[in-house]
Amino acid sequence: MQRSKSSLAALTLGAIGVVYGDIGTSVLYAVKEVFGSGHVAFTPQNVYGVLSILFWTLTTIVSLKYVVLVLRADNNGEGGLIAMLALASQAVKDKPRLRSALLGIGVFGTSLFYGDGVITPAISVLSAVEGLEVVSPHFGKAVIPLTLIVLFCLFAVQKRGTSGIGRYFGPVTLVWFTSIAALGVPHIVGHPEILGALSPHHALGFIWRSPGTSFIILGAVVLCVTGAEALYADLGHFGKKPIRLAWFSVAMPALTINYFGQGALLLAEPEAVKNPFYMMAPDWALIPLVIMATMATVIASQALITGAFSVTKQVIQLGYLPRLNILHTSVRDTGQIYIPFVNWALFLAIVLAVVMFRSSSNLAAAYGIAVTLDMLITTVLTFFVIRYGWRYPLALCIAATGFFFLVDLAFFGSNLLKLLQGGWFPLMIGSIVFMLMMTWKRGRELLNEKLRADAIDLRDFLTAVFVNPPTRVDGTAVFLTAEPGAVPNALLHNLKHNKVLHQQNLFVTVRNHEVPWIGLDKRLQVEALGGDCWQVMVHYGFKNDPDLPGALALMRGRGCELESMTTSYFLSRDVVTPTIGSGMAPWREKLFAQMHHNASGAAGFLNLPSNSVVELGSKIEI
């Protein structure tokens, strides 16, 4: 019992750092942007109304939608949009058109994650460093350079991994939540009447009096739920109970106290609207607060960067992006990975955002479209999971998700008003990633169709070969093939040029499935072909780490004995040539060919020993 309590405490502390780091830093800019937009007349009544809307937004979207409803839709203990997409896809697998539509929606939602991933670190770190302007206006010119230095250092250390410093994320973020709550308490004590804004009638009254203004300011109010989707995305790391406990015991109370403290300050000092968070603090605490805020925003950004690596790996395994160079940064934790291309592409996009928008207020205009559309997509997928996966009655499904759908739609509609002010930026990034994903997926389909059309039946081929068998050499040859039952090009090249066949031959096809994990008991499907040849299907979930030698070691005891020192892996390296009249526009064919050319080899992705790999090239027209 004592051990389970300490384990729960450790997981809860970890969740505070990783799950709630992003939403915890929203206090830096949310209230400032609502009143700084110029749409809300600065009156005590409006302060009450805005605070009430902020509180009930947190309650509705985070507490009710994500913590209560969405966390229930786990995929074998895993969360995130890809896990939800896999659940929804499986739930409607007998409805191919609906399944295709949901896959398209889900992939688009996943691509929007990268758009959000550019804005969030930029606005978080920039808003923290902007606290220096409150210390002294002379620091204003240093804000952009300091922000870029902090961001560069953050991305530069990624290749070393975060397993060492990761253990401090929870404690530091807990100190942050304690600090922001402590900032708010004196101001609430000075104006306890501000707690009246907890009543929803202030929010409803504001909406009733100013429906147009209410709709417009939702584009700024959404800043208070930045990172809400992390609750679901990190489900597999921490579990439901620690995430819920961390929210209701630490994050939600601290955020509420700080927001209401800012509201109390604005009632007493309306001029504090230019930066109410930092102006709550006494002068002596400003520099330490800027340092603490910068640390908190770096931790929040780190969680997002780690998430980008994880999502990219999952998308690659589902076949929507080409293989990239993936490095493991921890021997003990296989989930700790580093993808150089994603790291520096994200860094350059964030630098572009900081240089283009130059302030957290300008970046606030860019924030919202991608994340609210993601939230909307999550609600849609949740409906199909509980309707077709859990088989709940239609009326109950509509009741459970309909309200959240309308709330998400209102926030998305409001953020569309910011499209020209900056909302186009994350939407553009998401659209580019979506185009790349769909081009790769369609290109692979065309490539596989071409391979199937030209394929030679493996059984018939082996029967013909064994009529007049070539020289057999010691050892095992592993031939990778995209289609089971087809002769791999590498085998044809090997017989043509070397005129030998190994003593044991495995024809291996790797399949990735729309489930997070596939256990070792279901890893292999083996079919004997005769003549010491086997057809092997290797199955992985999108969160499994592909390790082909490790998987093939399970062949022992099935009539095939593999020795690592005498096993060679034969891979076909296809050179794709675009042709006129295929299933894609010419520019997409050329793009696919370039992506295929730049893709990392299968050897590294499948963890093959480099000194045992033989690559043989072939040219394919699509």
From Swiss-Prot:
What membrane topology does the annotation report for this chain? Multi-pass membrane protein
Q: Which domain of life is it from?
A: Bacteria
One GO MF term attached to the UniProt entry: symporter activity
Q: Which reaction does it catalyse?
A: K(+)(in) + H(+)(in) = K(+)(out) + H(+)(out)
Which subcellular locations apply to this protein? Cell inner membrane
Q: Which GO terms describe its cellular component?
A: plasma membrane
Pfam families from the xrefs? K_trans, K_trans_C
- InterPro entries for this protein: K+_transporter, K_trans_C, K_trans_N, Kup
Q: Print the keywords alphabetically.
A: Cell inner membrane, Cell membrane, Ion transport, Membrane, Potassium, Potassium transport, Symport, Transmembrane, Transmembrane helix, Transport
Transmembrane region(s): 8-28, 50-70, 103-123, 137-157, 169-189, 215-235, 247-267, 285-305, 337-357, 366-386, 393-413, 419-439
The family classification in the record reads:
Belongs to the HAK/KUP transporter (TC 2.A.72) family.
Role according to the record: Transport of potassium into the cell. Likely operates as a K(+):H(+) symporter.
Q: By what name is this protein known?
A: Probable potassium transport system protein Kup
Q: Which organism is it from?
A: Paracidovorax citrulli (strain AAC00-1) (Acidovorax citrulli)
**What's the name of its gene?**
kup
